[in-house]
């Protein structure tokens, strides 16, 4: 039995989702959003750190998974998103949690089956996979998707005996 905390980072809204994994089943434990209230950016980072730390204290997860930064058109937005991720990751490392990072494409592929899925498709599939009565809010659904992605990735590694295929075909690019 393992508990996975998934994080969808944002400088204004950071989504979180917590699932428990028993064998091949995934059980919903909780989800929501950390909403930062201040215009003072360093204080918003503190709110993210404190919020993630509290969620870790509340749910006692074994694993922490977070979405990787994507390339944004606006460099300032990308930097702020990276700093928000950093605040969440520091909260996880303070609790001695192993940190896993996944791209948006990996997360969408694990949850929906295609890396080009829309947000509404992710919400719908998260609802179906976790047997929720209603679709979660977009940021919380994305965070639950991160946790589901980590579950599927770790299950794949277990079935491979903890190692990937070492043969490589073709050229490295």
UniProtKB/Swiss-Prot annotation:
Entry's Gene Ontology cellular component terms: cytoplasm; Holliday junction resolvase complex
Stored InterPro entries: RNaseH-like_sf (IPR012337), RNaseH_sf (IPR036397), X-over_junc_endoDNase_Mg_BS (IPR020563), X-over_junc_endoDNase_RuvC (IPR002176)
Entry keywords, A to Z: Cytoplasm, DNA damage, DNA recombination, DNA repair, DNA-binding, Endonuclease, Hydrolase, Magnesium, Metal-binding, Nuclease
Reactions catalysed, as given in the entry: Endonucleolytic cleavage at a junction such as a reciprocal single-stranded crossover between two homologous DNA duplexes (Holliday junction)
Binding site for Mg(2+) 1: 8, 139
Single annotated GO MF: DNA binding
UniProt-annotated location(s): Cytoplasm
Active site: 8, 67, 139
Enzyme type, top EC level: hydrolase
Biological process per Gene Ontology, one example term: DNA repair
Cofactor: binding details: Binds 2 Mg(2+) ion per subunit.
Superkingdom: Bacteria
Residues that bind Mg(2+) 2: 67
Chief location bin: cytoplasm
EC number: 3.1.21.10
Keyword Nuclease included in the entry's annotation: yes
Cofactors: Mg(2+)
Family assignment from sequence similarity: Belongs to the RuvC family.
Role this protein plays: The RuvA-RuvB-RuvC complex processes Holliday junction (HJ) DNA during genetic recombination and DNA repair. Endonuclease that resolves HJ intermediates. Cleaves cruciform DNA by making single-stranded nicks across the HJ at symmetrical positions within the homologous arms, yielding a 5'-phosphate and a 3'-hydroxyl group; requires a central core of homology in the junction. The consensus cleavage sequence is 5'-(A/T)TT(C/G)-3'. Cleavage occurs on the 3'-side of the TT dinucleotide at the point of strand exchange.
Complex and partners: Homodimer which binds Holliday junction (HJ) DNA. The HJ becomes 2-fold symmetrical on binding to RuvC with unstacked arms; it has a different conformation from HJ DNA in complex with RuvA. In the full resolvosome a probable DNA-RuvA(4)-RuvB(12)-RuvC(2) complex forms which resolves the HJ.
Record-given protein name: Crossover junction endodeoxyribonuclease RuvC
Organism of derivation: Shewanella woodyi (strain ATCC 51908 / MS32)
Gene: ruvC
